[in-house]
A protein has these predicted regions:
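Conserved alpha/beta core of the MobA/IspD/sugar-nucleotide pyrophosphorylase nucleotidyltransferase superfamily
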Residues: 5-6, 12-13, 187-236
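A short, N-terminal amphipathic alpha-helix
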Residues: 47-63
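Short phosphate-binding loop-to-helix
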Residues: 79-113, 188
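Conserved donor-nucleotide/metal-binding helix-loop-beta segment in metal-dependent transferases, i.e.
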Residues: 124-164
Length: 236
């Protein structure tokens, strides 16, 4: 059986052919750690608004060829289809298994790179995704120039946006889609960086607005402090 995490034969990296995957565990019971600040109905509205915003931002970003939502939740998939995303029903397993399904989809459609975008980033905007892709292209061009002068070649690129604690991964770009295995979970930032190093990938880490995710009441306060709280979460 083919290993879905195994890199394929190296090819020129084209960051104008990016597939985006948005993993969603579910809408009904999401973000229970926000229970001290939001009731179940408010949490549901928050998660739904963030998912819609994430899809809209990705669909409108130049260079992103297609956007898919992978989820075991029929409600999340219906929302995704309504918002214009491809839907990938997840049969089982956790986040990394769902992303492996997304990787297989990206390969089937011939994408040169895969962008993983969690659906809990209040600062998600097309402008932010464009900034990430532009920084990736600039870093890739500089690395290609450096390695070319040294007589070697760039075969893989990994770009990561860490969370505010610099422990988790808030956004991950991998080129080609199989450049590294997914290691989302506790300590994922270090795990992804180590995987990039072992695989000989060019690695770039970018902090910024997308380093804020919504997991705790303190995160909600941080979002509100920079004008991203309340109803704004559901707006484009």
């Amino acid at each position: 059986m083919q290993d879905r995490d195994r890199p394929t034969t190296a090819a020129p990296i084209d960051l104008g052919q990016v597939a985006a995957i948005i993993p969603v565990r579910g809408l009904e019971r999401a973000k229970t750690r926000l229970g001290e600040a939001l009731d179940p109905e408010e949490r549901h509205a928050l998660v739904e608004g963030l998912l819609r915003r994430t899809i809209r931002a990705a669909v409108a970003t130049p260079g992103i060829r297609a956007v898919a939502v992978v989820s075991p939740d029929p409600e999340a998939l219906a929302l995704a289809a309504d918002a214009g995303a491809v839907t990938l029903p997840q049969g089982g397993g956790g986040l990394n298994e769902g992303l492996a399904d997304g990787r297989a989809w990206a390969r089937e459609m011939g994408a040169a790179a895969l962008l993983v975008i969690p659906a809990d980033l209040p600062a998600i905007r097309t402008s932010e995704l464009r900034r990430i892709l532009e920084a990736a292209r600039d870093h890739l061009a500089a690395s290609v120039a450096d390695t070319g002068a040294a007589g070697t070649a760039v075969t893989a690129l990994v770009v990561l946006v860490p969370d505010r604690a610099r422990e988790g991964t808030n956004l991950l770009l991998v080129a080609p889609p199989g450049a590294i295995p997914f290691r989302f979970g506790p300590g994922s930032r270090a795990a992804h960086a180590a995987a990039a190093s072992r695989g000989g990938a060019v690695y770039l880490e970018l902090a910024g607005p997308l380093s804020l995710d919504l997991d705790t009441p303190d995160d909600l306060l941080a979002a509100e402090a920079i004008g991203l709280g309340g109803p704004v979460v559901g707006q484009p």
